[in-house]
């Protein structure tokens, strides 16, 4: 097996719950996925699907006293991150495993110069015993890599636009050249033209540094442009996964994936109304029985309401749906 086809990260049967004062929220339910070296996997789904909770669990950042892992493993290069003490996890977080959060506006400390914020990461993980001058040189290098003039490193976050703030966040995330980067909706707060610039930059840096990446998004266009594989999440579960070709060019899809594609406006077809997925996403504190998507599914049968769907695989393409298990699809 080549190095590129070796799993760097393996999530096995992971389940995560949040306990509030009144409700038990089942945010992630028996999720399994793997990311190979130098590979980018897109994690797609509506708001509330469990994507961010999955990412925060990988990073060891679940809120204490509320979030709880109830089962499963997160293996990074063979080490179960869930079994590590917080002090040991600190050695991984930021150095070999890094994350870009959704909103660059709130990810930076407003009273510390941006260059100092990049330098802090290098100082925290200074296993190469870099001198202050070498750290300053590395900060300059990272700023150049993300397209920011190094002389701006003494400025504060409020002096940067949203797109430039996100570039600073990316510089922080990649400063220690992590093996895996988790990007949680990295372009949501940015204008469309800036989104394209940031995505192109991230893709270029990924190739340059040899980094694996998990791209969390609800934008299928971003997935098609940047990812090698795709996992579609609904109600805390992965309902379909496969290569980008399987998802975007294949003929068989989970009904939820069909709904996601159907809700995208198309320029080649004249229409008066968009086609949203009917109904609301399942309440994670009161999940439907059987297939969690059955209340919104146009193909739902009585079996779907009472039995969890099996995983049906064709090569790397996996769909969790009774239709394909029974061969009922058209």
What are these regions (language model features)?
Residues 1-252, 319, 325-330:
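ABC transporter nucleotide-binding domains
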Residues 5-7, 243-330:
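Short catalytic/signature loops enriched in Gly
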């Amino acid at each position: 097996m080549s190095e590129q086809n070796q799993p760097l990260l393996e999530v096995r049967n992971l389940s995560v719950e949040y306990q509030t004062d009144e409700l038990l929220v089942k945010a992630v339910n028996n999720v399994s996925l793997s990311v190979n070296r130098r590979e980018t996997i897109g994690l797609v789904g509506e708001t509330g699907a469990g994507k961010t909770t999955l990412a925060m669990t990988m990073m060891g950042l679940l809120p204490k006293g509320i979030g709880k892992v109830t089962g499963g493993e997160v293996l990074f290069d063979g080490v179960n991150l869930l079994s590590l003490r917080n002090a040991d996890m600190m050695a991984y977080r930021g150095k070999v495993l890094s994350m870009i959060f959704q909103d660059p506006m709130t990810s930076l400390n407003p009273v510390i110069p941006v260059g100092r914020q990049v330098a802090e990461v290098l100082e925290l993980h200074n296993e190469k015993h870099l001198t202050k001058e070498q750290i300053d040189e590395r900060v300059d290098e990272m700023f150049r890599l993300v397209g920011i003039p190094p002389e701006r490193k003494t400025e504060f976050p409020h002096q940067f636009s949203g797109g430039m703030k996100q570039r600073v966040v990316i510089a922080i995330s990649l400063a220690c050249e992590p093996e895996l980067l988790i990007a949680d909706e990295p372009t949501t707060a940015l204008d469309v033209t800036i989104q394209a610039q940031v995505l192109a930059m991230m893709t270029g840096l990924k190739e340059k540094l040899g980094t694996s990446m998990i791209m969390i998004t609800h934008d299928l266009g971003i997935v098609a442009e940047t990812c090698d594989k795709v996992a579609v999440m609904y109600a805390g579960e992965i309902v379909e996964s496969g290569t980008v070709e399987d998802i975007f060019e294949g003929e068989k899809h989970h009904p939820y994936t069909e709904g996601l594609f159907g809700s995208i406006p198309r320029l080649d077809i004249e229409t008066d109304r968009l086609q949203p997925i009917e109904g609301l996403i399942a309440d994670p504190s009161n999940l439907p029985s059987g297939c969690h998507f059955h209340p919104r599914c146009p193909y739902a049968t009585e079996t779907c309401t009472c039995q969890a769907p099996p995983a049906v695989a064709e090569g790397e393409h996996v769909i969790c749906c009774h239709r394909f298990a029974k061969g009922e699809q058209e």
